[in-house]
């Protein structure tokens, strides 16, 4: 008899948790996106504030997720952000789009899969040309990687479109 009571209590709590998640799905996704997009920026700030271990842990957390090439990354107070330009633009845009969607979701229609696919074309072209240039040294992307160059703006714009 005690097992049935515990089981039904667990089931009731599980149901309540699922219901809460279904009601607040956008809050959950936006919170995750903001945390994911924000932590890489805290890495150089922690290092600059005298907490090198925390900064390095945050940096290494994102190592498997981004190439982190210094010439393609932002720096704050002389320390590298844990994302490259493209990833920074992409994940910041996702977080901002989620917040804007939360404000305007009653007034906008969902995008079609075709539109989503079209928005991926620029980043696929940009990323594949970078890959080909890096692997084969073709030189057609040799304009440099500094902020303000064509390569920088292509990475930022295509990252934000995703």
Question: Model-derived features: where do they sit?
Answer:
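Extracytosolic (periplasmic/ER-lumenal) interhelical loops and adjacent juxtamembrane/interface segments
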Residues: 45-83, 139-147
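Hydrophobic cores of alpha-helical transmembrane segments in multi-pass inner/ER membrane proteins
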Residues: 33, 91-98, 155-162
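Membrane-interfacial loop-to-helix junctions in multi-pass inner-membrane proteins
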Residues: 20-27, 106-116
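Small-polar-interrupted transmembrane alpha-helices in polytopic inner-membrane proteins
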Residues: 32-40, 96, 109-134
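Alpha-helical transmembrane segments of multi-pass integral membrane proteins
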Residues: 124-162
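Cytosolic juxtamembrane amphipathic/interface segments immediately preceding
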Residues: 9-22
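N-terminal signal-anchor transmembrane alpha helix
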Residues: 23-53
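Hydrophobic alpha-helical transmembrane segments
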Residues: 82-102
